[in-house]
């Protein structure tokens, strides 16, 4: 099997499974739908691992070829092709590996769904195909199609329960916010096509960069901007939407309206990292603009800290993990801004495993609670759900950066990258990610203690009903006990827990201090020496652990855990008093900094008001009443006046004829004698 065939199989097998489950779901049934999609993703996962191993042992070389030319227009060729290198191979394993776990988990989670079971499996396999096409693309046009495809499938999955108004509102919100980002992304691609040699293939664009290094573009009369900087910022606007960076982050928490498995696959491990992957892939361009890198770093720092604050007050178990995702995406963006692209991609990988684990463990707890998602109704689930308890503990320990867990190596590396960066804004970024360590540890273990320790709070509640999942699910009754989830749910948790512990230790040497990303990621060491300083300071996993003992990071994390234990185990009455004491801050957090209100009342209503104005003035007054109906009224008015000449008397008509003859004679003589 040649390389082209291998990569086509990896990309297309999930698509085939999606089409079979979607088009023939009623004929093959529920078992047939999940079997064919799981087999398809499993084939892709195994072959992706084979490809990655080939790069690790040195038997596989970088692949960059076109499959076919899709469109030729005006001397421009738009092709479909594959670029497979170490970064692509790593992402292929992450996407297909997490997707396989989610497919298996979904069998148990969606077991009670009466309708839409086959449709759901079709969607998640279609998403896997779309994400693979995005990361394997070798040109901007294919990247954009993959970019839009994952957005479309995300829209379909967030609104999976389309009879629920909150779900349809959430998927529309996600769709519109991402269109804002995609508009900037498309403008950036347009600049690449117009000024970077007339090609959209990555290798051609990178080769042309020296020709536009000092080029400027006039956005406003008399104001010259660096072409590279403008292009970088516009491309990053797309990343802000897709990777949920402030202020385009508002769609992600609401995306929790979709079933839990897609939260793990799309909104934690894969789609939301697409923007980060794109920036890393474009490192040769971004390295030419320190201004763009500073902007990226500051936006990432704002997202990391201020989204973490919002996670502190959430009571929905899934929304805690959602805001955790936002904060961690901010961490990765800080690394990109510090030119530590390899560190960002390292955290993309480790985060994919432990965050997917946290989402799926949250879903398991929801199953045990009969689909009640409110943590205030839980407590002491450790007694009833030991596997879920242990795996969520592992996920949270990795999230907060506990030494020897995967998240420790990547997260601490990001903090060190911000520390060593010399770009404007790096001081604020370092403070933000450092403060976020405490915040992350606090909200992660607040969730953990509320769910798995303390009193069994559902026993003191009136009989309640929750619409947290499906259409007809109820929470636990007073005398009911939670139950551990079936093996089809807990097995993916166990399998994800393993890389959440060990993958960081295994991968840190080659990915950060070795040649794993050689010739894939470009860093201008003279202008942005961060990663090179880190290579001199640290020499692997054990060096990072040793350093942590002398760093404030570890002690901030411990302080966060102890604070959560004190407030939610020892003194559970205290959080309500603190919230009342700091009521203005609590209200600010509760209203998510009023950004939703701003977007709805200013932009959404403003757009509707502007549209109403143009409709009333332009469409109704000018076009309808003026041009269309107005012309008819004018003809009618003229006809009414002409009609008065129709008297019915012969002498009137004779006089008109004489008058006409005189006019004609006058015109004739005027022409002859003038």
From Swiss-Prot:
GO cellular component: plasma membrane
Bilayer topology: Multi-pass membrane protein
Class in the EC hierarchy, top level: translocase
The protein, known as: NADH-quinone oxidoreductase subunit L
Coiled-coil boundaries: none
Membrane-spanning residues: 4-24, 36-56, 67-87, 90-110, 115-135, 140-160, 180-200, 219-239, 259-279, 293-313, 348-368, 385-405, 425-445, 488-508, 549-569, 653-673
Species in which this protein is naturally found: Neisseria meningitidis serogroup B (strain ATCC BAA-335 / MC58)
EC number: 7.1.1.-
Compartments reported by the entry: Cell membrane
Homology family: Belongs to the complex I subunit 5 family.
Catalytic activity from the UniProt record: a quinone + NADH + 5 H(+)(in) = a quinol + NAD(+) + 4 H(+)(out)
PANTHER family xref list: NADH-UBIQUINONE OXIDOREDUCTASE CHAIN 5
Record's function text: NDH-1 shuttles electrons from NADH, via FMN and iron-sulfur (Fe-S) centers, to quinones in the respiratory chain. The immediate electron acceptor for the enzyme in this species is believed to be ubiquinone. Couples the redox reaction to proton translocation (for every two electrons transferred, four hydrogen ions are translocated across the cytoplasmic membrane), and thus conserves the redox energy in a proton gradient.
GO molecular function: NADH dehydrogenase (ubiquinone) activity; quinone binding
GO biological process: ATP synthesis coupled electron transport; electron transport coupled proton transport
InterPro entries according to UniProt: NADHpl_OxRdtase_5_subgr (IPR018393), ND/Mrp_TM (IPR001750), NU5C-like (IPR003945), Proton_antipo_N (IPR001516)
Source superkingdom: Bacteria
Cleavable signal peptide: none
Keywords: Cell membrane, Membrane, NAD, Quinone, Translocase, Transmembrane, Transmembrane helix, Ubiquinone
């Amino acid at each position: 099997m040649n390389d082209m065939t291998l990569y086509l199989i990896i990309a297309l097998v999930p698509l085939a499974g999606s089409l079979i489950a979607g088009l023939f779901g009623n004929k093959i049934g529920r078992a047939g739908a999940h079997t064919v999609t799981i087999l398809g993703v499993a084939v892709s996962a195994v072959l992706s691992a084979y490809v990655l191993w080939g790069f690790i042992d040195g038997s596989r070389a970088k692949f960059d070829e076109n499959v076919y030319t899709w469109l030729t227009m005006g001397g421009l060729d738009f092709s479909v092709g594959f670029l497979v290198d170490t970064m692509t191979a790593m992402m292929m394993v992450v996407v297909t590996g997490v997707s396989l776990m989610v497919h298996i988990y979904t069998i148990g989670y969606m077991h009670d769904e009466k309708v839409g079971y086959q449709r759901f499996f079709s969607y998640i396999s279609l998403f896997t195909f779309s994400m693979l096409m995005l990361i394997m693309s070798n040109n901007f046009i294919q990247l954009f199609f993959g970019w839009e495809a994952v957005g479309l499938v995300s829209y379909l999955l967030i609104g999976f329960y389309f009879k629920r108004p909150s779900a349809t509102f959430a998927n529309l919100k996600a769709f519109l916010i991402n269109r804002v980002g995609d508009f900037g992304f498309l403008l950036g691609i347009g600049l690449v096509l117009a000024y970077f040699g007339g090609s959209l293939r990555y290798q051609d664009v990178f080769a042309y960069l020296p020709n536009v290094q000092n080029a400027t573009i006039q956005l406003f009369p008399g104001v010259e901007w660096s072409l590279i900087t403008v292009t970088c910022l516009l491309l990053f606007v797309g990343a802000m939407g897709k990777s949920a960076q402030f202020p385009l982050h508002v769609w992600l928490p609401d995306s929790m309206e979709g079933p839990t498995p897609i939260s793990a696959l799309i909104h934690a491990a894969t789609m939301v990292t697409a923007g980060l992957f794109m920036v890393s892939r474009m490192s040769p361009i971004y390295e030419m603009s320190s201004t763009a890198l500073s902007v990226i770093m500051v936006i990432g720092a704002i997202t990391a800290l201020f989204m973490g604050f919002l996670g502190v007050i959430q009571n929905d178990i899934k929304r805690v993990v959602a805001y955790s995702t936002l904060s961690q995406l901010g961490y990765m963006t800080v690394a990109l801004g510090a030119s530590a692209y390899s560190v960002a991609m390292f955290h993309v990988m480790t985060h994919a495993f432990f965050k997917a684990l946290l989402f799926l463990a949250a879903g398991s707890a929801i199953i045990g609670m009969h689909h009640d998602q409110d943590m205030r109704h839980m407590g002491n689930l450790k007694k009833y759900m030991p596997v879920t308890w242990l795996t969520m503990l592992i996920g949270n320990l990795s999230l907060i950066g506990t030494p020897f867990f995967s998240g420790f190596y990547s997260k601490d590396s990001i903090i060190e990258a911000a520390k060593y960066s010399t770009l404007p804004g790096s001081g604020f970024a370092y403070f933000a990610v450092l403060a976020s360590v405490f915040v992350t540890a606090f909200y992660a273990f607040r969730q953990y203690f509320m769910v798995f320790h303390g009193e069994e709070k559902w026993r003191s509640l009136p009989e309640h009903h929750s619409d947290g999942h499906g259409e007809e699910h109820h929470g636990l009754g007073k005398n009911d006990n939670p139950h551990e989830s079936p093996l089809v749910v807990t097995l993916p948790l166990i399998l994800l827990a393993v890389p959440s512990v060990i993958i960081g230790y295994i991968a840190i040497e080659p990915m950060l201090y070795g040649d794993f990303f050689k010739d894939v990621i470009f860093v201008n060491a003279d202008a942005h020496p961060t990663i090179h300083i880190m290579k001199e300071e640290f020499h692997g996993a054990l060096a990072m652990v040793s350093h942590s003992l002398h760093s404030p990071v570890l002690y901030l994390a411990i302080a966060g855990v102890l604070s959560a234990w004190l407030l939610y185990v020892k003194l559970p009455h205290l959080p309500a008093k603190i919230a009342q004491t700091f009521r203005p801050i609590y209200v600010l957090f509760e209203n998510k900094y009023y950004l939703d209100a701003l977007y709805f009342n200013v932009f959404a209503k403003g757009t509707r008001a502007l549209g109403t104005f143009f409709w009333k003035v332009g469409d109704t007054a000018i076009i309808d009443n003026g041009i269309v109906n107005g012309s008819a009224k004018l003809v009618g008015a003229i006809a009414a006046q002409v009609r008065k000449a129709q008297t019915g008397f012969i002498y009137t008509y004779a006089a008109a004829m004489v008058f006409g003859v005189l006019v004609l004679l006058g015109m004739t003589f005027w022409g002859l004698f003038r």
